Amino acid sequence: MQEQAQQFIFKVTDKAVEEIKKVAQENNIENPILRIRVVPGGCSGFQYAMGFDDTVEEGDHVFEYDGVKVVIDPFSMPYVNGAELDYVVDFMGGGFTIRNPNATGSCGCGSSFSCG
């Protein structure tokens, strides 16, 4: 019996794509590749790290939205599978947020999460 490959999903809202393009343009980045990683740290065990990258590494999961590539490494992908990157503006300003259905808890500051 052949094993079926797992289908990974990571969504990026139109607002987030717009903001990624804006930040890339401000930094003279022509073909933006946004890398999202899950790293150990914070009060709850894991936290997100995001930044522009120059390359897509072997094994990376690549999601493309309107010319913006979002790449996630193989370690991080199971932790963010089904999650959504958004850009929200509130009275404190604007920022990226990840809505993650895999997160079973988060700390009070909102910068780290746990998975169970």
From Swiss-Prot:
Query: SUPFAM superfamilies from the entry?
Result: HesB-like domain
PROSITE patterns hit by this protein: HESB (PS01152)
Q: Which residues form a coiled coil?
A: none
Pfam families with a match to the protein in the record: Fe-S_biosyn
Q: Known InterPro entries for this protein? A: FeS_biogenesis, FeS_cluster_insertion, FeS_cluster_insertion_CS, HesB-like_dom_sf
List, in alphabetical order, the GO biological process terms annotated in this UniProt record: iron-sulfur cluster assembly
What's a GO cellular component annotated to this UniProt protein? cytoplasm
GO: which molecular function terms? 2 iron, 2 sulfur cluster binding
Q: Which Gene3D superfamilies match?
A: HesB-like domain
Stated family: Belongs to the HesB/IscA family.
NCBIfam families named among the record's database cross-references: iron-sulfur cluster assembly accessory protein, PRK13623.1
Descriptive protein name: Protein aq_1857
Q: What organism does this protein naturally occur in?
A: Aquifex aeolicus (strain VF5)
